Amino acid sequence: QTFLDDLAKYTGVTVKPFFAADYAGIIEGMRFGKVHVAWFGNKSAMVAVDRSGGEIFAQTIAKDGTEGYYSLLIAHKDSPLNSLADVLKCDKSLNFGNGDPNSTSGFLVPSFYVWAKNNQTPDKCFKRVLTSNHSGNALAVANKKVDVATNNTENIYARLAKTNPKAFKNIKE
């Protein structure tokens, strides 16, 4: 709420939050005039520009000057998975949390760097493949509902560590 209050004060406009389960919902909200400002990753931002007339006007920069964020594969801290090679055994024994199809870090980047570059797909490798947003994937890993999932550094280190430290302590990259 603090961010919304600050934004309203700075712009002089009443700011109302809009919630959706995924990027597609936010993009459609923009398309129909329900959303005027949103935070997207690269892929969803491009879709918002194409489908909703959005404009890209800012980029995240950390206090240390680091630009953007990075895609991750995460597992429970007690998991025997410690490397990409462990994940790519593809023996259909594991459950996988895939990201929102409109997410750069949760779907697009892993689709290329993990799956395409290794001539694999999640469906060939895992017993079950579930699709969720970053928060859902983090909680699924922390609660051992999936064995490995996609995520990103911004969601894990900037959000989850602050909003749910117990879950954060149960996750490793």
Model-derived regions: residue spans:
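Bilobed "Venus flytrap"/periplasmic-binding protein-like clamshell domains
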Residues: 1-10, 20, 43, 64-139, ...
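Extracytoplasmic small-molecule ligand-binding "clamshell" domains
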Residues: 1-46
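Generic structural signal for residues in well-ordered beta-strands
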Residues: 15-17, 128, 171-173
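Short beta-strand-centered segments that line the small-molecule binding cleft or hinge
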Residues: 37-38, 46-69
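Extracellular/periplasmic catalytic domains that process cell-envelope and extracellular macromolecules
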Residues: 31, 48-50, 65-68, 89-91, ...
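Periplasmic-binding protein-like
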Residues: 62-72, 162-173
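A ligand-binding cleft/hinge motif common to bilobed small-molecule-binding domains
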Residues: 41-53, 113-116, 140-143, 147-171
